[in-house]
Regions:
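NAD(P)H dinucleotide-binding glycine-rich loop of Rossmann-like/cofactor-binding domains
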Residues: 78, 88-152
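Short glycine-centered segments of the SAM/dcSAM-binding site in methyltransferase folds
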Residues: 84, 147, 171, 236-237, ...
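C-terminal hydrophobic helical "lid"/dimerization subdomain
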Residues: 273-330
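Glycine-rich phosphate-binding loop and adjacent beta-alpha segment
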Residues: 223-292, 329-330
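N-terminal Rossmann-like NAD(P) cofactor-binding module of classical short-chain dehydrogenase/reductase
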Residues: 86, 149, 214-217, 239
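Glycine-rich beta-strand-centered segment in the early N-terminal region that forms part
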Residues: 21-38, 50-91
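Short amphipathic alpha-helix with an adjacent loop that forms part of the alpha/beta core around
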Residues: 200-210
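Mid-domain Rossmann-like dinucleotide-binding core that forms the NAD(H)/NADP(H) cofactor-binding site
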Residues: 122-198
Length: 330
């Protein structure tokens, strides 16, 4: 089968595209004929040598996937050959990833694809959608009528947070760096959009939410705790999902006096059961046209190395090249 893979960690140049043996289906696994995958920052960190866990050699990267079941192990009873499925949490914890024509995946990580969606959409929404849902509803416990600030409303996770928060009736404040992204945030449902290149973000948040925001979702790899604590309401909740190596200053005094709380989480540590709860809502919202995948561009799988370069330019070099996900067609 054709696959994107690497044998040693390093720059995107270590990624090869070629033939690898087809995967063997385990007893409680399925073989998915992959239709589309998407690129996430963690894919680039692993490829660059982040020492999270030992990697198989060769290693196929990729967390997200959408495609069709073509084979099943004898213990799989709740799925069927020919069924369209989507999911994430691959290429992690030592598991092989999805950037290949075929992927052997434990059945517990699979979710049925909604009717009238395509593989490109479901691959684009997988990790970022599950991440947003976990943070909003299992950690921040966002309620209808509350106010949330999320940085970067057109980003992969940010765009999901905006849409999901609006879906339950929250007030959404977000940021955008140019008029095009401002318009996209408005289209996604944001109530207040702050141009961080032209305005003082802290002052604009105070104008939009005089009593503070109930939830502050930080997407930066270097969290701005001064901004967050100043912007939060009494008993405000801060969500952290990035910044593994960050060690920024922290304003302890106002944080505890307000009775705030901080919730950090890594999506890939959520159980399959927790992720199924997320997937159920995602499927419902996709079917109801409430939630839409945000795709910046679609490339062939053979251009995985270039996709990694683009992702790194956006994530690490902060070039704001992307407005949505990079999807690879298989």
């Amino acid at each position: 089968m054709k696959a994107a893979y690497f044998r040693t960690t390093g720059s995107p140049d270590v990624i090869e595209f070629g033939d690898l043996p087809e995967p063997v289906c385990g007893d409680d696994q399925v073989i998915v004929k992959v239709g589309a995958v998407s690129v996430n920052p963690i894919d680039t960190y692993i490829r660059n040598g982040a020492n999270y866990w030992p990697l198989p050699n060769p290693f196929i990267p990729g967390c997200d996937f959408a495609g069709e079941i073509v084979a099943m192990g004898p213990q799989v009873k709740h799925l069927s050959i020919g069924q369209r499925v989507w999911g994430s949490n691959q290429g992690l914890m030592g598991r092989q990833g999805t950037f290949a024509e075929l992927a052997a995946i434990d059945s517990k990580w699979l979710h049925p694809s909604p009717e009238f969606t395509d593989d490109t959409e479901m691959a684009a929404i997988a990790l970022v959608g599950i991440t947003a849902h976990l943070g909003l509803f299992q950690h921040a416990m966002l309620q209808p009528g509350e106010t949330i600030f999320v940085r970067g409303g057109t980003g992969g996770v940010g765009s999901m947070v905006v849409q999901m928060a609006k879906a339950i009736g929250a007030v959404v404040i977000t940021t955008a760096g140019n008029p095009t992204k401002h318009a996209k945030c408005r289209e996604l449902g944001a109530d207040y959009i702050i141009n961080y290149n032209e305005s003082n973000v802290a002052e604009e948040i105070k104008q939009a939410a005089p009593n503070g925001v109930n939830v502050f979702w930080e997407t930066l790899r270097e969290p701005d705790f001064e901004l967050a604590v100043g912007a939060m309401s009494e008993e405000g909740r801060m969500i952290l999902m990035a910044g593994r190596d960050a060690r920024p200053p922290f304003p302890v005094g106002p944080f505890y006096v307000k009775g705030c709380s901080m919730h950090g989480f890594a999506m890939f540590k959520a159980s399959a059961e927790q992720q199924h709860v997320c997937a159920s809502d995602i499927n419902h919202w996709m079917t109801s046209d409430i939630l839409k995948a945000q795709i910046d561009r679609v490339l062939p799988l053979s251009e995985t190395a270039q996709a990694h370069r683009l992702q790194e330019a956006s994530t690490l070099q902060k070039q704001s090249l992307l407005s949505g996900k990079i999807v690879l067609k298989v």
